[in-house]
Amino acid sequence: NPTVTPLGNFMHALKGKNAIIISPAPRAEKTSTKTVDLIREALAKNGAPEDLIQIVNDVTIEKSQELMANCDLVIATGGSGLTKAAYSSGTPAYGVGPGNPPVIIDRGYDLKDAAENSIIAVASDNGILCDGDNLLLYPQDLEAEFFEEFRKAGAVVFDNADDVAKFRDALFENGKVRPGLVGKDTNVIAEAAGYNLPEGTKVIGLKIEGVGKDDILGKEIMGP
């Protein structure tokens, strides 16, 4: 996440009496830079050195590699490629790879509450956070009731296999999420699949029959 990750890592670094340099994702450089600028302003207002947090400008792979090779500790948040690069940098590293937490909705739990909280989690920052409720597992006999609560809470649910297949093709290419759809609004994702959504749609729900390797939609998507 281009805002939460720099902020969270900075707070942990500061608590340990460390400075931190952020190497942002290229497509999110403006957002991360704005976040760092706000933190630097807050540091200055409180009489602390602004350079406790810095950011790499015009980031490139080469700059990131140089930074990893010369710092004291690497905290790598991203895909498997980034994590592998961090572990191969020669510098002690903590790596965080893809996340796609499944949420199990048990019988007897408040379906309205489950739907509302899941939508809050996934809609936050357009699903960029990889700890959102990306996969929901629910009792099959409660499907109709759960879907209804999901729709009331602001989701559009596609439960027809042909519709879901179009989203599958739109979201993934050669087994990987299309970068151009990461963190995009629901209407942008829907249009890529050939659909128009009602205004104000917070989350797109897709019914799948398999989990894990049985359906690629069970992978990390990073979108609402």
Would you name each region that the model predicts?
Residues 53-71:
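A structured beta-alpha segment of the ubiquitous adenosine-cofactor-binding alpha/beta core
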Residues 1-41, 46, 89-91, 100, ...:
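Conserved small-residue-rich beta-alpha loop and adjacent elements
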Residues 212, 217-224:
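Short, intrinsically disordered, charge-balanced linker/junction segments flanking boundaries
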Residues 74-86:
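Glycine-rich phosphate-binding loop
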Residues 24-27, 60, 79-80, 98, ...:
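Short, ordered loop/turn segments at secondary-structure junctions
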Residues 70-74, 134, 224:
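Short active-site oxyanion
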Residues 8, 12-19, 83-212:
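ALDH superfamily catalytic-core signature
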